[in-house]
């Protein structure tokens, strides 16, 4: 076996046309392993401004491994979102007693909308780079709808650390036809309760994403205000 900086190759003695079988190191991709993989949805968009909302393979430098995650770069102008959890109604009971500050990784290597959650270290790293959190319903089938939806600043609702039962400030919240902007509403997350609001039954909001800001987007948002 021959090894270069970003790839390892095995000689194929029985194949005259293809003499080597080469694989890239986890951090690299491309035909010649010349491209460094993104470590976040934000970095993916920065590397390729034409990136669309879809599942990407990202590189985790802590564990030197790849994982799959859905990056949303298109649904809300000025935002790029990293999906940290998704589950169907059928699977909601499996998540009902799992607050975000406790580890419960599921299908990180083979993404599925019906049952997915990043590991606790990966969620914490994502949150530390981010400014907002949101929850949506049926995003994979209906795209973004502002019914059964909330968005808040992580400085107000830090889902990765908050053990809380009380009122918190939201930028926007809409639950079963009731909505308000820049207002307070109930938020609950306890050691054996998944994050939720009292306005709706646990499990009706089932897609949670964290926003990673890009400098040019923050500047646009300030000008619009």
Predicted regions: what they are:
Residues 1-225:
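Mature extracellular or lumenal effector domains of secreted proteins
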């Amino acid at each position: 076996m021959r090894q270069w900086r970003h790839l390892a190759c095995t000689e194929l003695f029985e194949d005259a046309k293809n003499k080597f079988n080469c694989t890239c190191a986890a951090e690299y991709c491309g035909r010649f392993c010349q491209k460094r993989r993104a470590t976040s949805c934000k970095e993916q968009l920065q590397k390729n401004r034409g990136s669309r909302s879809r599942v990407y393979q990202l590189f985790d430098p802590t564990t030197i491994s790849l994982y799959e995650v859905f990056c949303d770069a298109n649904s809300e102008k000025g935002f790029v979102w990293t999906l940290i959890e998704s589950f169907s109604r059928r699977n909601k009971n499996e998540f009902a007693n799992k607050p975000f500050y406790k580890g419960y990784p599921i299908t990180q290597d083979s993404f599925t909308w019906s049952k997915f959650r990043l590991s606790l270290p990966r969620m914490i790293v994502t949150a530390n780079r981010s400014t907002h959190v949101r929850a949506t319903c049926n995003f994979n089938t209906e795209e973004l709808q502002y019914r059964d939806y909330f968005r808040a600043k992580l400085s107000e609702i830090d889902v990765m650390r908050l053990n809380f039962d009380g009122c918190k400030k939201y930028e926007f919240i809409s639950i079963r036809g009731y909505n308000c902007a820049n207002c307070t509403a109930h938020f609950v997350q306890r050691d054996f309760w998944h994050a939720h609001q009292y306005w709706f039954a646990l499990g009706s909001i089932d897609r949670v994403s964290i926003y990673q800001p890009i400098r040019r987007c923050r500047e646009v948002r300030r000008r619009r205000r």
